C-alpha cells in the first residue's frame, strides 16, 4: 500500500507528498499534469521502477490537485511552481534529482532548473510550457 504524507505549507495549507526510499542519493521527482494527481499509471509505474533500481521516488500534488489544500481555480503556474520548490527544499536539498514531468508537470519542472543546482536530469512527457515571459 502506498503511504502519503501531508507537509504543512504556509498557514493551514498542506501538500500531499509521496516519498519512497529516503536513504537514496538519487531521486526521481514526478510532477503530474493539470487536474491530475499521484494515483495514475505514470506515477505508479515510475515508483515501481525506482524501487526495482533502488532509486528514491518523490511525487507531490500541487494545491487544488488530488488531496492537497486549496481550490484548483485559484491556482497559477507560479503558485504550483512554488509548491514544488518548497517540497524539494524540504525533502531533497542534498540529493541528486531527476525530474520527470507530465504536461503541466514538465513546465513546472523546467522552472525548477533555475532554483536547484542538484537537478541532474529532466524528462518532459507531453511537455506544455509557455515561453511568453
Go through each PLM region and give its residues.
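N-terminal cap/lid segment of alpha/beta-hydrolase-fold proteins
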Residues: 1-23
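Short beta-strand element of the alpha/beta-hydrolase
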Residues: 25-33
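The serine-hydrolase catalytic nucleophile loop
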Residues: 35-47
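Active-site loop signature of alpha/beta-hydrolase-fold enzymes
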Residues: 36-37, 63-68, 130
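Conserved alpha/beta-hydrolase
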Residues: 47-69
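Catalytic nucleophile-loop/oxyanion-hole region of alpha/beta-hydrolase
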Residues: 65-91
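Primarily recognizes the serine-hydrolase "nucleophile elbow" in alpha/beta-hydrolase
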Residues: 90, 95-133
